[in-house]
């Protein structure tokens, strides 16, 4: 059914969606493939608690629920569709390791990276140049886990329509770099006890060496990022890791430390369009990251940073809406860091708006959100700007420092 016509995928989604709605699930307004079902207490649905969460990816499904509820959902799906079950250790190339005693869940792509190396380092002329396949594999890696290499892979993707053997060799160099990082990953800790780096607002001691000192803030509770697992392998049975996630979802007192970084690289390339970089983190764990070319040409670094901050605010609100859909309690605002004093003053002081009045209405979103209290805009020095990884190729020392901070010192054993 899935591979018959252009409409097959849409027909399949409509069929499965209508079935899940009949089971009492509610689809997220932000992501049509993300479902939750309210917990029923004494015959009355309690919207503040979830008894099951489902995430879809085409014909793959990941279900999080207590064992007895999971079995009921399994039987209902089995009666309607032909389904198979698999373990939760891998899904769509991502490995998930969980230590129930330590309360630590790690996501990495070591296995997928090894298979990618095996596929593309042995060049086969009979297959032709597989540049697009290689770039596609690299994109999947940097979008799922190894976000620090996004800018390099993005540059490779620009050459897909007109590539040469030199471009293929460049892609292999990026693959080599990713191999050196394959033991890094994203880590979630029970209770939200991830270390969160607090960037410096001024240079300490007048030198960069002191900016390597870590200042950490420990969050109270929360695992918002398990919900980022929107990649699945078939209908998976409940395990201790998933059950722990459900327990966290049921805690209405869950709180988070919420941080974002916004940066811009001014007037890049022949088009002179600036590059926006952003990263959104909860409890010190990266949730969203991206590198985008701005659609307009601005006349100053200040304007470029202001536009980037607005883009970052959109990502913050997307994350916040998803958290609210799951009925988490997280009243504190996001702290968004920028390394532009001018951008900071414009977004918080109406008397400085003259510098950006020429920008379209949508780019003033950052000011509206800051004034609403949902985001507090703060300054940090450039050396501590994590979003620098998504706007430009930084120095070797800074790249190493920011990479460690991005992955929160998470190295796979």
Mark where each language-model region is.
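RNase H-like nuclease module associated with reverse transcription
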Residues: 159-162, 256-257, 295-413
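Residues immediately flanking
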Residues: 5, 58-60, 67, 94, ...
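Charged, flexible boundary elements
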Residues: 23-43, 176-249
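Conserved pre-motif C helix in the palm subdomain of viral-like polymerases
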Residues: 1-76, 126-151, 263-277, 301-321
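C-terminal reverse transcriptase regions that engage the nucleic-acid substrate
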Residues: 88-197, 209-222, 228, 381, ...
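RNase H-like nuclease fold core
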Residues: 204-219, 233-302
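Reverse-transcriptase-like RNA-dependent polymerase core
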Residues: 14, 38-46, 108-122, 274-290
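A common structural junction motif
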Residues: 75-86
């Amino acid at each position: 059914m899935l591979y018959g016509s252009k409409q097959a995928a849409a027909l399949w989604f409509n069929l499965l969606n209508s079935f899940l709605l009949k089971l009492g699930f509610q689809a997220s307004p932000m992501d049509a493939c993300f479902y939750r079902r309210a917990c029923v207490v004494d015959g009355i649905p309690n919207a503040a608690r979830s008894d099951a969460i489902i995430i879809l990816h085409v014909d793959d499904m990941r279900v999080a629920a207590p064992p007895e509820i999971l079995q009921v959902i399994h039987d209902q799906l089995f009666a309607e569709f032909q389904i198979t079950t698999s373990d939760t250790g891998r899904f769509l190339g991502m490995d998930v390791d969980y230590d129930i005693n330590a309360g630590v869940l790690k996501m990495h792509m070591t296995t997928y990276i090894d298979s990618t190396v095996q596929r593309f380092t042995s060049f086969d002329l009979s297959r032709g140049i597989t540049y697009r396949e290689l770039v596609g594999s690299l994109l999947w890696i940097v979008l799922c886990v190894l976000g620090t290499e996004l800018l390099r892979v993005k540059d490779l993707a620009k050459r897909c329509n007109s590539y040469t053997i030199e471009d293929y060799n460049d892609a292999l160099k990026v693959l080599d770099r990713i191999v050196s990082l394959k033991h890094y990953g994203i880590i979630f800790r029970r209770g939200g006890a991830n270390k969160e780096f607090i960037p410096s607002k001024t240079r300490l001691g007048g030198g960069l060496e002191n900016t390597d000192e870590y200042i950490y803030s420990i969050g109270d509770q929360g695992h918002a990022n398990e919900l980022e697992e929107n990649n699945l392998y078939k209908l998976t049975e409940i395990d201790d890791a998933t059950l722990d996630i459900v327990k966290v979802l049921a805690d209405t007192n869950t709180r988070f430390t919420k941080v974002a970084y916004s940066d811009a690289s001014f007037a890049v390339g022949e088009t002179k369009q600036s590059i926006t970089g952003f990263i959104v983190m909860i409890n010190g764990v990266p949730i969203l990251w991206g590198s985008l070319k701005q659609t307009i040409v601005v006349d100053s670094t200040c304007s470029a940073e202001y536009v980037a901050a607005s883009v970052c605010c959109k990502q913050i609100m997307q994350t916040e809406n998803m958290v609210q859909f799951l009925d988490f309690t997280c009243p504190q605002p996001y702290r968004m860091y920028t390394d532009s004093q001018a951008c900071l003053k414009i977004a918080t002081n109406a008397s400085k708006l003259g510098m950006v009045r020429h920008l379209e209405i949508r780019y003033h979103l950052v000011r509206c959100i800051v004034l609403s209290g949902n985001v507090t805009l703060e300054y940090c020095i450039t050396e501590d700007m994590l979003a620098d990884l998504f706007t430009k190729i930084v120095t070797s020392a800074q790249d190493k420092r920011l990479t460690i901070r991005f992955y929160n010192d998470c190295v796979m054993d």
